[in-house]
Amino acid sequence: MTVSRETDSQPGFDAENPALRLRTVCLQNGLSVTDVQIAQLARFVELLLEWNQKINLVSRKSANEVWRNHILHSISVLFVLELQRGASVMDIGTGGGLPGIPLKILRPDLTVTLVDSIQKKVKAVESIMNELKLVGIEVLCARVEDMPKRKGLRASFDY
């Protein structure tokens, strides 16, 4: 895996086009990304930053920081794990939908369940998912320790 902790001033980071940088890193790690997926990720970053002005979803405040420190980190699991086709994934403590939404965008075959205990974050993520027209993804407002009690969720996730 060739993911590094770059800053805007370091060589190789394209501050003008972080989506291009992300695509390059993905290709270097054997993951092809379509223009549609890049556009979806770009819209996700916009929506995340819009919602972040209302409620605290992520610590990073600039688009470049979100691309580098949230999007790239979220999808880096795809560089090291071969998630089986159609796998079910649970994102515990999703906050602003990270890493679940970027994973779903790049791997639409996955079934993704996002979980957060804070209702206002869940509402923000629901809005973002609806805006992106994502299917095969849901968000639940719950505490992780209560998840085994929920009908149909006990031991039903691959990752």
Where are the regions a protein language model picked out?
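Class I SAM-dependent transferase core
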Residues: 2-85, 90, 127-137
